[in-house]
Amino acid sequence: MTPGEVRRLYFIIRTFLSYGLDELIPKMRITLPLRLWRYSLFWMPNRHKDKPLGERLRLALQELGPVWIKFGQMLSTRRDLFPPHIADQLALLQDKVAPFDGKLAKQQIEAAMGGLPVEAWFDDFEIKPLASASIAQVHTARLKSNGKEVVIKVIRPDILPVIKADLKLIYRLARWVPRLLPDGRRLRPTEVVREYEKTLIDELNLLRESANAIQLRRNFEDSPMLYIPEVYPDYCSEGMMVMERIYGIPVSDVATLEKNGTNMKLLAERGVQVFFTQVFRDSFFHADMHPGNIFVSYEHPENPKYIGIDCGIVGSLNKEDKRYLAENFIAFFNRDYRKVAELHVDSGWVPPDTNVEEFEFAIRTVCEPIFEKPLAEISFGHVLLNLFNTARRFNMEVQPQLVLLQKTLLYVEGVGRQLYPQLDLWKTAKPFLESWIKDQVGIPALVRAFKEKAPFWVEKMPELPELVYDSLRQGKYLQHSVDKIARELQSNHVRQGQSRYFLGIGATLVLSGTFLLVSRPEWGLMPGWLMAGGLIAWFVGWRKTR
């Protein structure tokens, strides 16, 4: 370790000890060397004994700075890892830091724009930042080309070395967790840190955020539910992003929304509809929808529209994940726990050798008490949390896309019920989910699949003669192999002629299945059935030789 890393590690340890976070380590795990090490740091007592553990952890992370604050925010969404009293405290972490010098931001903008002065591209550039966070800060201006109001987001200077240095130390501490905590291995601390690192590094690339915002804007073009500000890609780079300035009411400012005459019930329901549309229609969802990133338009309060900003973190689901997730929700609310268990196995989220009966019983035990509440009071996010926590006992692998989804759903649900406490999430979401599943099966789905594949088939038409020729040639080779096997079988001293028939059929079916498996994977299960039938025939023939 470098001297700088040693100093930083010392500061981290001193901070943890001054907040009494060594209490997190169970006494049976405190070995003699650890105990001696703690006694040697006697001048670092717990100075916050009057505060609960969760609050002390939050305050310690706050003191350690931006990288640790964002790490705590990410951990607050992993309620499968922490008890509620800790997760709730981590959720209170605020990513607010002092702004850096506006003149320095101006220099960065000029460097990104080819060295020309800011005045060459923008009018009314405001040197004082509009907002500031740990990764970037925002300045206002007008585009010189058309006079439109914009905000310019600039990455903090020299932030990358700081992030890398702290991440290195977080990785070191993560490797100690399995040794110090009895449940440390299940927490998979290194994987959690790796997930955080990816999210953090992605946020440092504003070209990625620009592309995300453009995609979301395209998906909701002309939508009455959600507006994404326009991005000006010609002005964007890795360290700078320029987008339309918006004016709206923060979604957390319920008093102003009510004063503006907003239809709160419709607004809450639209939040749910926006989320499920992003997930199931678009397979591309804004995964950082906390209240600070959501506004409501002042216009048409009777027909309210959300405004979304800060698209640095997005999630996506593949077709299989979407289908299994939708069917899981519906099966759960129909209390069909057997179906829920089978879906987890079919999706590959839990190992294929999982005992479905035991898994069903575990899900029933955890989830059935939820239905003691009215449906309107059941939390979708906590349903997912209960399912995933139960599944982890059956060795469910961490699914990053589902973790993002769960986090976003908790945000959406929290905002919706803050706006309209009587919001019935299930009543709002069920028609959407049932309609989506219905659309994925039957004739409409078949026609859509044909339309999707038709261009590929047309493109491959000129190659068809060559493909047919290759198939015939491989077929000849297959026939030659079958004949050779048949001759070898005939040369054996088989006591019953019938056995030769079964052995030949078995060989033919196995070889045919193998050939189709390699050359025609689109035939689905057919090659497998042929090979299975061949093995059965072969086994019957072998038995008849005995």
From Swiss-Prot:
Name the Pfam families for this protein.
ABC1
Protein known as: Probable protein kinase UbiB
Q: Which InterPro entries match?
A: ABC1_dom (IPR004147), Kinase-like_dom_sf (IPR011009), UbiB (IPR010232), UbiB_bact (IPR045308), UbiB_kinase (IPR050154)
UniProt cross-references to HAMAP family, sorted A to Z:
UbiB
In terms of CDD domains, this protein maps to: UbiB
Q: Which domain of life is it from?
A: Bacteria
Alphabetized GO MF terms: ATP binding; protein kinase activity
Active-site residues (renumbered): 288 (proton acceptor)
According to the record, the segments passing through the membrane are: 501-521, 522-542
Please name every pair of cysteines joined by a disulfide bond in this record: none
Q: Which UniProt keywords apply?
A: ATP-binding, Cell inner membrane, Cell membrane, Kinase, Membrane, Nucleotide-binding, Transferase, Transmembrane, Transmembrane helix, Ubiquinone biosynthesis
Native organism is: Escherichia coli O1:K1 / APEC
Main localisation, per the record?
Answer: membrane
Describe its membrane topology.
Answer: Multi-pass membrane protein
Q: Which top EC class is given?
A: transferase
Supply one GO BP term.
ubiquinone biosynthetic process
Q: Which PANTHER family match?
A: CHAPERONE-ACTIVITY OF BC1 COMPLEX CABC1 -RELATED (PTHR10566), PROTEIN ACTIVITY OF BC1 COMPLEX KINASE 7, CHLOROPLASTIC (PTHR10566:SF113)
What is the annotated localization of this protein?
A: Cell inner membrane
Per the record, its GO cellular-component terms are:
plasma membrane
Explain the purpose of this protein: Is probably a protein kinase regulator of UbiI activity which is involved in aerobic coenzyme Q (ubiquinone) biosynthesis.
Which EC number(s) does UniProt give?
A: 2.7.-.-
